[in-house]
């Protein structure tokens, strides 16, 4: 039993703001920290509302939610015990990918001679991450949609503890796959867009039509209720020349 078994936090939305009231034995002592936490949260822009919950970014759980309370508990543990606890677990579930990106961050770590983790092994890692306090489980690759057990792995994530996310190139976001992802409980995903110019994006990834398919897939995901963001490759040059800003503008235009 930990000290937090004696702390009960009730959260609600009042006037479009999230408020938390700490009870239990530790409630009075920690209320000021809870107030500070939600003061920072409420200063952020609400980018989406899902089932009465506020979403501020794709890397933290929505509030109020059970996963969000775990996120807050992690903050309190770090403050009291002076020990860092992970908030995110990035799990590379496959090295397979249809693209051959010139800037691939995974490529240096890929060894075809090594076997991929089994589903049971991945689930064990997920369990361990949740036990450590992670509130976000991200499946990456390679291309995670090339792993046929992806939906099973998404469904396995205990939604009362964490939210599941994937990073994808968008090529396999068909109507059927998006429906399966939504049914499995995928909360959000990031689609890779490397340039505001379709030709350059396709060239970077060595896949003709990749740009169009990515945005078509993004639209399907939004319609299915999956929060959808864009992941882009940035360099100091692309930032200075405004190329990254153009990608962000397209993301806003696409919704």
Task: List PLM regions with ranges.
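Flexible, acidic/Gly-rich N-terminal and inter-domain linker regions that tether
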Residues: 1-87, 99
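Short N-terminal helix-initiation segments at or just after the protein's N-terminus
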Residues: 28-36, 102-107, 164, 171-173
């Amino acid at each position: 039993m930990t000290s937090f078994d004696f702390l009960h936090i009730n959260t609600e939305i009042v006037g479009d703001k999230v408020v938390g009231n700490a009870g239990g034995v530790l409630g009075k002592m920690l209320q000021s920290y809870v107030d500070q936490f939600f003061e920072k949260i409420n200063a952020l822009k609400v980018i989406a509302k899902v089932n009465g919950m506020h979403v501020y970014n794709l890397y933290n759980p929505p509030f109020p939610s059970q996963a969000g309370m775990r996120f807050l508990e992690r903050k309190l543990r770090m403050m009291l015990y002076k020990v860092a606890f992970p908030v995110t677990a990035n799990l590379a579930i496959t090295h397979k990918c249809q693209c051959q990106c010139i800037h691939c961050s995974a490529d240096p770590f890929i060894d075809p001679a090594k076997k991929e983790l089994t589903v049971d092994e991945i689930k064990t890692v997920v369990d361990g991450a949740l036990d450590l306090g992670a509130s976000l489980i991200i499946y990456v690759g390679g291309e995670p949609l090339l792993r046929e057990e992806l939906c099973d792995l998404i469904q396995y994530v205990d939604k009362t503890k964490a939210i599941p996310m994937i990073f994808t190139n968008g090529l396999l976001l068909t109507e059927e796959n998006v429906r399966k992802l939504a049914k499995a409980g995928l909360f959000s995903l990031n689609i890779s867009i490397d340039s505001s110019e379709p030709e350059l994006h396709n060239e970077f990834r060595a896949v003709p039509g990749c740009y169009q398919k990515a945005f078509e897939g993004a639209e399907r995901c939004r319609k299915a209720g999956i929060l959808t963001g864009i992941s882009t490759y940035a360099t100091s040059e692309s930032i200075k020349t405004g190329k990254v800003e153009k990608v962000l503008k397209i993301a806003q235009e696409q919704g």
